[in-house]
């Protein structure tokens, strides 16, 4: 089952869905993408009915903008809970707390940020929305003085950012403060199959311009990168999938490795099957 949303539906995705003939939710984006195609589009009620007949079947999307619709319409199954587990960075940290017993993180309300004593934080650290998207609202803090600068920047950004994405994609009431994870960063697209086994689709090295760069601009990959890291990342995904009971579930995970077998998960984004679409 597929739900299409802005910002982009690629030609490859349209061609693939034309060949598959799987249910596609009727909305403005789907009608625009398939206006000259015989591909069937399901009304909301028919789509929900098809999902309820088999709640274990995969639901894929090209955009996190679909999360709000899923939360409101597919709530008879377990999908919204699993999406929320990974969209909420605080909930995810709780899930893997014993995997990283010495890792510092703290969740805090937006209005309470001014009351945080920066001297009690593991500087450098990062502060970001608990439910975030791309690098919006994310700030590196490299000194105690830089803490207040980050808080001031967040306050200035909040109202502007709220107009950009649905609330389920980006929530700015709660933030999480985390210690910085050192090492080389990678982005991994994967999915869990019907038996709960993780299948890695790609591994991308994430390059940054500087230590305080948090952008998503530059990624690289190669046979060497994939061969070097595949098995370690596979084992990590198996453990996370077991804890979250994931089946027929696509994810995008960002992870850092220190080159000595120690892996630190930055975050996991759910539901969107990015690779090749």
Go through the PLM ranges and name each one:
Residues 64, 130, 176, 180-181, ...:
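Anionic group-transfer/hydrolysis microenvironments
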Residues 96, 121-141, 160-183, 188, ...:
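ATP-grasp fold ATP-binding core
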Residues 241-275:
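Conserved metal-phosphate-binding beta-hairpin within the catalytic cores
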Residues 125-155, 185-187, 208-225, 277:
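Glycine-rich phosphate-binding loop of ATP-grasp-fold ATP-dependent ligases
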Residues 1-38:
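Short, charged N-terminal beta->alpha structural module
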Residues 30-120, 133:
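Conserved N-proximal alpha/beta basic substrate-recognition cap immediately N-terminal to
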């Amino acid at each position: 089952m597929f739900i299409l949303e802005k910002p982009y539906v690629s030609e490859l995705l349209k061609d693939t869905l034309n060949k598959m003939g799987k249910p596609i939710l009727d909305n403005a984006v789907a009608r625009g993408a398939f206006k000259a195609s015989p591909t069937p589009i399901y009304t909301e009620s028919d789509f929900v009915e098809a999902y309820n007949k088999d709640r274990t079947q995969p639901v894929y999307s090209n955009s996190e903008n679909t999360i709000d619709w899923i939360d409101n319409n597919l709530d008879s199954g377990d999908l919204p809970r699993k999406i929320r587990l990974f969209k909420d960075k605080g909930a995810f940290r709780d899930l893997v707390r014993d995997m990283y017993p010495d890792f510092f993180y703290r969740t805090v309300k937006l209005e309470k940020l001014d009351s945080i004593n920066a001297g009690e934080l593991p500087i450098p650290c990062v502060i970001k929305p608990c439910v975030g998207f791309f690098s919006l609202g994310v700030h590196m803090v490299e000194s105690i003085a830089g803490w207040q600068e980050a808080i001031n920047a967040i306050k200035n950004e909040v109202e502007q950012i709220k107009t950009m994405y649905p609330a389920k994609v980006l929530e700015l009431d709660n933030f999480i403060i985390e210690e910085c994870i050192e090492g080389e960063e990678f982005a991994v697209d994967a999915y869990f199959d019907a038996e709960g086994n993780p299948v890695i689709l790609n591994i991308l090295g994430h390059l940054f311009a500087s230590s305080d760069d948090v952008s998503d601009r530059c990624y690289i990959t190669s046979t060497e990168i994939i061969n070097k890291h595949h098995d370690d990342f596979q084992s990590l995904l198996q453990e996370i999938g077991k804890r979250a009971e994931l089946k027929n579930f696509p994810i995008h995970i960002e992870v850092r490795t220190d080159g000595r077998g120690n892996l630190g998960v930055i975050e996991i984004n759910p539901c969107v099957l990015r690779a090749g679409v």
